[in-house]
Design a protein with these regions (language model features):
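Interdomain linker/hinge connecting the two RecA-like lobes of the SF2 helicase core
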Residues: 18-21, 159-283, 288-289
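A short beta-strand element within the Helicase C-terminal
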Residues: 103-107, 323-327, 332-348, 353-355, ...
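Post-DEXD/H (motif II) to motif III coupling segment of the RecA-like Helicase ATP-binding lobe
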Residues: 113-172
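Conserved helicase ATPase core of P-loop NTP-dependent helicases/translocases
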Residues: 66, 283-287, 292-334
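Inter-Walker segment of RecA-like/P-loop motor cores
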Residues: 58-102
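Conserved pre-motif I regulatory segment
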Residues: 1-23
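Conserved segment of the helicase C-terminal RecA-like domain
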Residues: 360-389
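Conserved Walker A/P-loop ATP-binding site and its immediately adjacent core
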Residues: 26-40, 49-72, 118, 291-292
């Protein structure tokens, strides 16, 4: 589908219902399509005699309000021949404040943020003539919720389809397989952390001795050994959850899974730093798991704790700086100017995050995405799923930084 065909399909589907989920790959123009839909709806015969129209735009973060205002101005605004247009922008965390009036059209930007139970309850109190939900990836359960409760229709165009239809450029994908060190005991494995008493230091070969003695111990181990222990712990919590359906077990399972991905990202910081050194004269974005990782590999770090994040983002787009590292904050509503290389230091099992980041990487006419990953780990599983459907001719396996 072309952008015009996507828009026409949106028009046809919203004629059947009052709720539309627009699930389009990052970079395909969700914002413009939604604004065109708003103008189409409010200029239809149902609103021809209105003197005032209320439009609600819900966003994930406060900074996104500025992005939306810039997009509204860029595409000519929201207009009606006679009615006064009132546009209200609120963050999802302030949804409850929006139940005070009737909105003719509500845009739910990055609609997956409304998926928690508390926000879905708040959603019930909103009075909206039309709902337009936007996201690159809408979770299956949320789609079902809107379908069953609002009779929502969905228009979809994923990254692969957008590339095939030349809406987005086809990236060159560089897979850089790595092996966890299984020789040098450079890591520390903490055992029985909740036990009182002095901390004992030992080696991995004495793991079971310390586990049985219930001593708080720090054991020297290799990268591979530590990753194996993460795998075992995660599998144990997962099995306990499956047996008991205990919410604390589920939370522990997911928490440890996140810590495992964080650890694997930590292990490759040296490799990522070397890649960035090789690309010193290029324009790059590096996706990291934590603030510490971002600050380790780059000088210009965009994250929630950096008061100068917006300034750095603008400096990058103005080409005053060529390298930025990001922690989550650039997953959504960020238009990166002429960014040729994207480096993935960490991976996410979220069905939303990986497609967003890959889409964010396709803003250059000839984008290159570099995936350093550890073989035989959860990273390899996530990566395999993330790139399925991409043109195999555009995927290349490299074994050294010099091949970049």
């Amino acid at each position: 589908m072309t952008r015009e065909e996507i828009y026409q399909q949106c028009v046809e589907k919203i004629a059947k219902t009052n709720a539309l989920m627009v699930e389009l790959a990052t970079g395909t123009g969700k914002t413009k399509i939604s604004l065109d839909l708003v103008n189409y709806l409010i200029n239809s015969k149902w609103y021809e005699d209105r003197k005032e129209l209320n439009i609600l735009i819900l966003v994930a973060k406060r900074v996104h309000k500025q992005t939306w205002q810039a997009e509204i101005d860029k595409w000519g605004g929201i207009h009606h021949p006679t009615a006064k247009i009132n546009v209200r922008m609120e963050c999802y965390e302030s949804m409850h404040k929006c139940a005070d009036k009737l909105y003719d059209v509500a845009i739910f930007d990055e609609v997956h943020h409304v998926g928690s139970e508390s926000r879905l309850e708040t959603l019930k109190a909103l009075r909206c003539g039309y709902i337009i939900g936007l996201s690159a990836t809408i979770p299956r359960k949320l789609k079902q919720y809107f379908k069953y409760n609002y009779h929502a229709e969905t228009v979809t165009c994923d990254i692969v389809e957008a590339i095939e239809n030349e809406i987005l450029p086809e990236p060159q994908i560089l897979l850089f397989p790595l092996m966890l060190d299984n020789r040098n005991p450079t890591e520390w494995l903490e055992i029985n952390a909740k036990e009182k008493g002095p901390i004992v230091r030992g080696t991995y070969k004495d793991l079971w001795k310390y586990k049985k003695s219930k001593q708080h111990a720090m054991l020297a181990c290799t990268q591979r050994q530590k990753a194996i222990e993460y795998d075992k712990l995660i599998e144990w919590f997962k099995k306990q959850y499956m047996l008991r359906h205990s919410e604390p077990m589920k939370q522990s399972w997911l928490f440890q899974a996140g810590k495992r991905l964080e650890y694997l990202a930590d292990c490759k910081l040296g490799i990522v730093t070397d890649i960035l050194y090789k690309l010193a004269n290029e324009r790059t974005i590096t996706f990291c798991k934590t603030i510490e990782q971002a600050e380790s590999v780059g000088k210009y770090c965009i994250h929630s704790q950096n008061a100068k994040a917006d300034e750095m983002y603008n400096s990058f787009n103005q080409k005053k700086i060529n390298h930025i590292t990001a922690v989550n904050i650039l997953n959504e509503n960020a238009n990166l100017v002429d960014c040729k290389y994207a480096i993935f230091c960490n991976y996410s099992s979220s069905e939303v995050c990986m497609p967003q980041r890959i889409g964010r990487s396709l803003r250059h006419k000839s984008p290159i995405i570099i995936f350093p990953y550890y073989q035989g780990t959860r990273e390899e599983e996530i990566l395999k799923k993330a790139i399925e459907g991409f043109n195999k001719d555009s995927i290349k396996v490299i074994h050294s930084i010099q091949e970049i």
